[in-house]
Amino acid sequence: MRIQTRMGAVLAALVLCTWFLMGCSQTADALDSSASEPPVVLVIGATGRTGNSILAALGDDYRIRALVRDLDRARAKLPANVTLFLGDVRQPETLTSAFEGARFVVSAVGARFVGKGDLADPMNTTELVDYEGVKHLAGAARSAGVEHFVLVSAMGVTRLGGAHDRMDNIMHWKLKGENALRASGVPYTIVRPGGLSDEAGGTLGTLVAQGDNQGPGQTNRIDVARICVRALTDPAARNVTVEVVKDASQPVVPPDGDIFAGLKVDVP
């Protein structure tokens, strides 16, 4: 009787050990699978022309999410591999789910104008989108533990009073949005392009500079998008602000290389 009891105990122990080892194996497999999956990047402003270029530049290296205000419009415009999240940068309570699990964020959001100084949406002002909206995004990124946030701003934001400022003080509010991101504590890169064009990327020289003292100029969206994507994983781009403008004397934006080498980190 004692032998049978001991044998039963041994068998029970063996069964428990087997279950434990199988559970550990399945957990390890799940972790390995998770580790091998591409990182998640959340794109804001994805339905715009610059946002579309960013999606293309991300390619297959990332699992891509897009924060959108209109799901039907986004489904019609965006690739099928983009996971859509309904939200509005003006309403911080709508941002949480899109940011959960995101490792990177790229924002090309901006107030949209129709005509000269006329807003497409009375509530789509530069103050509410380019400042308050970016501030909300930075707060959501901080809460979610985002590793790097790339913001597309505009060249000339520190030189107020120009023609663009006649449109709802756009440069003033973009600069405040930049400063809100800097103050958030989230690692960032701020990319300030010149006037955006839709020329083919990788064909014209591009100057990547600092100081916001470049003359007026154009930048094509594809090169801006490539620079944004490169900034996500380049340590030299951490907490850096750059201006980007076409310059025939400069090299084209390469598929790899040191775009951010030697640039100065922002001073708090």
Task: For each feature predicted by the language model, list its residue ranges.
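Bacterial N-terminal signal peptides
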Residues: 11-22
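N-terminal Rossmann NAD(P)H-binding glycine-rich loop of SDR-like oxidoreductase domains
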Residues: 34-60
